[in-house]
UniProtKB/Swiss-Prot annotation:
Protein name stated in the entry: RBPJ-interacting and tubulin-associated protein 1
Chain residue ranges for the region called Interaction with tubulin: 158-239
Subunit structure: Interacts with rbpj/rbpsuh.
InterPro entries: RITA1
Residues spanned by motif Nuclear export signal: 12-24
Positions occupied by motif Nuclear localization signal: 93-109
Reported impact of L12A: Results in nuclear accumulation
Length: 239
């Protein structure tokens, strides 16, 4: 009996010590497991791979049953003039410039706005937080100039002759009315006897005697300057 027990204990020890210990499994990041399955592809769809084409075989192209709806531009015959006008091709190795603008299609586009529903009407009511005092009533400030009638005779005279200064109409009360018949009114008087002052100028002289002397001196200076300029503009006889 003890021999049998010892034998059984030895067999148990061998059986226990003979098994390898299981290592702890590491936790993978993903909890999903991928299962690979064999796939099948019908290679006859891509043509017969075993049959080789004989290169010596001559192919006979049959005439087309109908004319294809294709368009190709005609051959362009280049002339010497056209070839010289074209810019020369850039040499090899030069970097190409990048296109700054994208190519846009030139075909007109159409959009049916009825697909997006009806148009939104503009709100005519005021916001609740806006006061009546703050609202501004906008009124159109329209203005049109008064019509001006231009006579045709005045337009023709303006085109033909030079521009002239416009003077107010002369009356009998004005100082110019007394000297209307005299031709040398704008010329300075040669002596004191030729000068006949008007009542209007006499009143001014009584009121402001100092201004009249300054004005007469300035007028005489202008006349002498004009006369001097006329003498300088005269051409010598040998020209």
């Amino acid at each position: 009996m003890p021999d049998n027990l010892y034998a059984t204990n030895m067999s148990l020890d061998l059986s226990i010590t003979g098994h390898s210990t299981a290592l702890p499994q590491r936790k993978s990041r993903s909890t999903y497991r991928f299962k690979a399955a064999n796939s099948y592809v019908d290679e006859s769809l891509f043509g017969s791979s075993g049959v080789r084409v004989d290169q010596t075989l001559q192919w006979n192209t049959a005439p087309p049953s109908q004319t294809p709806l294709l368009w190709s531009p005609g051959e362009i015959k280049e002339n010497k003039k056209t070839s010289s006008c074209r810019p020369k091709s850039t040499p090899a190795g030069t970097p190409r410039k990048k296109i700054q603008y994208r190519v846009k299609s030139r075909t007109p586009s159409y959009c049916d706005e009825s697909l997006f529903g009806g148009k939104v009407e503009e709100c005519t009511w005021d916001a609740p937080w806006v006061k009546k005092e703050d609202t501004v009533k906008i009124r159109p400030l329209l203005w049109s100039p008064s019509p001006r009638l231009v006579q045709q005779s005045s337009m023709q005279n303006a085109k033909q002759g030079p521009l002239r200064a416009v003077h107010p109409p002369e009356t009998s009360d004005s100082p110019l009315g007394t000297h209307k018949g005299l031709g040398a009114f704008w010329k300075p008087p040669e002596s004191d006897s030729d000068y006949s002052p008007s009542p209007f100028s006499a009143r001014q002289r009584q009121s402001t005697p100092g201004r009249e002397t300054v004005r007469s001196a300035s007028c005489s200076g202008r006349v002498t300057a004009r006369r001097g300029s006329v003498k300088m503009q005269e051409r010598p006889p040998w020209k």
